[in-house]
From Swiss-Prot:
This is DEAD-box helicase Dbp80. Belongs to the DEAD box helicase family. DDX19/DBP5 subfamily. It catalyses: ATP + H2O = ADP + phosphate + H(+). The modification Phosphoserine is found at residue 26.
């Protein structure tokens, strides 16, 4: 793996994500932002510095009676090859994460066991299944033995980089990307042990061009299954690949969500699985003080923000707007009044979004103005205040309580207290606010931003 690993190590993240075709928008322009699941997953993976430091709850559903029930507290307990263990430690993993403790004995069991795992990015699940992939390779056989499917080029590259780093001392293991831009000599069979790529490319190589024998695959990994379902065509391609595999092939299925659509998909792919659900600590309103401010219009909303900043010391704050136009208008006004402001909307490329988030997380900008493009899963530990310049509503104009929770749940985390401020302009938005209050059964207090005394109270 030496040459490939060096090549992968030399690639910069910015070069990888820069290949995303996000600069040119096709079709009708819209002022509303919708988070793309593949882009969001990529952002979370790249932004994650090691494992997420949140409380985790694990739900193990044992379906296969032959699957091991024990967990491990050290990597040594897995009896790995010395070269693989060395790679794990070189990556900075000292002890298994919570999902690794439980998943690895099943992933590495002999005979192989199938698994469905629900776990968000930052929990160590990629390292877990990559370890299983590397462990299963028989270097004496010069043909593909492991298939790992990702929904996009960029997510496949991310997985490949993990495999390269973990397998850097396993020099005999050969890995290849099956993604756009990768060409193959159709007169020769593929000899690399591990193929990581997108469904369409792997379908072409394995079935259309018959460059490797699908029946000889011993491990099949389907990663980011929820994103796969959301990507047109991938669902059917995955099923076509699965049908060509040996019934004894180990099937590993990973998803960040656990809805009915995902599980229906999983049941088509995985027989007799051990099911692991690992949930991050849910956003909670317990440590968050919620307020609403009555304003006459958009200018009144801006004046309310100005009054708040004029009376109390606000550290890091996120302001959510309904449209890109409103976000741009608000950013221009706040910047002209001397605030250090960053803007994050769907008009930015992934590279630009990474830069904005890195600058905000490092404190270079104190205010981040965004839309629903900043979806769940991206944590900012030092966040103190969330302002809903526009309350979240669904397509029917009704209160979107789930989005509200994910928005303000970014503050009041890690045992700290937070502040959420909702700006109200009319009876319609007041009803939305009231519906949110009833849904969570948590009082949203009125705040008079024309009173310095009232504002100072929320800062204590």
């Amino acid at each position: 793996m030496g040459d490939w690993a060096k090549k992968s190590e030399d690639q910069e993240v910015s070069k990888l994500v820069d290949k995303l075709n996000l600069d040119s928008k096709s079709g009708e322009e819209t002022d509303f932002d919708v988070a793309d699941p593949a882009e969001t997953s990529l952002l979370i993976k790249i932004l994650g510095k090691g494992l997420v430091n949140t409380k985790l709850s694990l739900d193990l559903q044992q379906k296969n009676p032959n699957s091991p029930l024990h967990s491990v507290k050290t990597f040594e307990a897995l009896h790995l090859k010395a070269s693989l263990l060395k790679g794990i430690y070189a990556m900075g993993f000292n002890t298994p994460s919570k999902i690794q403790e439980t998943a690895l004995p099943t992933l590495l069991a002999d005979p192989p066991q199938n698994m469905i795992a629900q776990s968000q990015s930052g929990t160590g699940k990629t390292a877990a299944f990559v370890l299983a992939m590397l462990s299963r390779v028989n270097v004496c056989l010069n043909h593909p033995q492991v298939l790992c499917l990702s929904p996009t080029y960029e997510l496949a590259i991310q997985t490949g980089e993990v495999a390269a780093r973990m397998g850097q001392f396993c020099r005999e293991i050969k890995l290849r990307f099956a993604v756009r831009g990768e060409e193959v000599d159709r007169s020769k069979k593929i000899e690399e042990h591990i193929l990581i790529g997108t469904p369409g490319k792997l379908l072409d190589w394995g079935i259309k061009f018959r460059l490797f024998d699908m029946k000889k695959i011993s491990v099949f990994v389907l990663d980011e299954a929820d994103v796969m379902i959301a990507t047109q065509g991938h669902h059917d391609q995955c099923i076509r690949i699965h049908k060509m595999l040996n019934p004894h092939c180990q099937m590993l299925f990973f998803s960040a969500t656990y809805g009915k659509e995902v599980m229906d998909f999983a049941r088509l792919i995985v027989a007799d699985p051990t099911i692991i659900r690992l949930m991050r600590e849910e956003e909670s309103l317990e440590n968050i003080k919620q307020y609403y401010v009555k304003c006459k219009n958009e200018e009144g909303k801006y004046n309310a923000i100005q009054n708040i900043y004029g009376c109390i010391s606000v550290g890091q704050a996120i302001i959510f707007c309904h449209t890109k136009r409103t976000a741009a208008w608000l950013a221009a006004k706040m910047t002209s009044d001397g605030h250090s402001v960053a803007v994050l909307t769907g008009d930015l490329t992934v590279v630009q979004r990474l830069d904005v988030l890195d600058r905000f997380r490092s404190g270079l900008e104190k205010v981040l103005i965004t839309t629903n493009i900043l979806s769940r899963g991206i944590d900012i530990e030092q966040l103190q205040v969330v302002v809903n310049f526009d309350l979240p509503v669904d397509l029917d104009g009704m209160a979107d309580c789930e989005t509200y929770l994910h928005r303000i749940g970014r503050t009041g985390r890690f045992g700290k207290s937070g502040i959420a401020i909702n700006l109200i302009t009319d009876e319609k938005t007041m009803k939305v606010c009231s519906d949110i209050e009833k849904h969570f059964n948590k009082k949203i207090e009125v705040l008079n931003t024309d009173s310095a005394d009232d504002i100072e109270k929320i800062g204590t």
